[in-house]
Amino acid sequence: MDKTMISGARALEFLGQFDFIREAGTEGELAAAEKIRKYLEQNVSGPGITFREEPFSFEESRILEARLVVTEPYQKEYSVVGCAGCGSTPENGLEAPFLYVENGDEISLAYARGKIVLVNGIVRKAFYQKLVEAGAAGFVMLSGTPIDEGEDLRPARRSLRGVEETPIQGVTVHYKDAVELVERGASRVRLILRQEKEKRISRNLILRIDGSQRADEILTVSAHYDSVPEGPGAYDNMAGAVIVMELCRYFSVHRPRRTMEFLWFGAEEKGLYGSLNYVERHGEELASHRFNMNVDLAGQTIGGTVIGVTGNPEICQILSAYAHEAGMGVSLKHQIWGSDSNSFAWKGVPAMTLNRDGFGMHTRHDTAALISVWSLERSSRLLAMVAERLASAEVFPFPREVPEKFREELNAFFE
């Protein structure tokens, strides 16, 4: 492998152009897509190299009003953010007894019927259904920490996904306000939540390099380029996007034996919408796909590198051997992963996600200031070596299969 072709400094310089919020379906995400397109046009070209954009639409909930007011034994309104996707309360809201149910254990939920409940965790599909079955009238999540100050006191935006029937509504309150609600003995509250659904447009960016000999076998290298609305998402996941760009540049010069597609997915943070659109749109072609190499969370100096593999267990052994040969520390995990690699594995294509521990994910602190040349270059070289070995192998080294255990978990994940 020609290591001189991989530059962490170049990757960081490009990443610095994206120090803005890129929420899916907004002008920020569109601006990022345009920057990526222009960079590819200027730096990656040649015979057998093609670029395309694939727009897609998705539905998003827009919060119109969210309020939480204590009515007994004191009166006070708290700052909250509405939970997107859980429907709306009646116009005048819902007033009910208030109860702290901690982690939603069986004993605490035995008292939840008819009450608006405060919970410690994020209410996702399974927890939501648990609250509905317990007869809760509504829910309040908490976010943040007891040491937050200033703008960090704003509650986080949360979304409920994959639920068709939404009989109860909820909001998020900051940790410090949650403490006050419990310690002051709030016993009755009014919850108001109004939201409406709107259609948004995102897009996937795809650069294809035709294979020189085994063009009918396809490898993909992917990362999402959107961010959450709370921050500019340098670590999550513009760093991953620029790593894919480095590999794209590398293989445009060192042409692969197998066809490679470099994918920048939109709307990952909204529910893997970009990668799901890709695997649905290219369903027939997926039979030719051998492996997806995804990057999600990268670039910070302090942390550990992890590769999560969703496929045959021998893939872990092969990737471990590659890492040993390169002398790069990495931990291998054999499981499904909460990123775009799941979309491929769900459709039967073995997949991996390269991931690095870090700080500030989904917050305003996730900025380019925390990203390092050293980390970007190291992760780029590791992934490039893996991709080059797989792209150039005379016979592909592992089967195109996803174990039944993972298929069941993925069906539940996407249900």
Task: Enumerate the predicted regions with their spans.
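Second-shell loop/turn segments in exported
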Residues: M1-M5, D19-G28, V117-I122, T166-I168, ...
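Metal-dependent peptidase/peptidase-like ectodomains
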Residues: P229, F265-F359, R364
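Catalytic-core environment of secreted peptidases
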Residues: I6-E27, I36-P47, I116-G121, G138, ...
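Extracellular/luminal Protease-associated
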Residues: Y78-V163, P167-Q169, V330
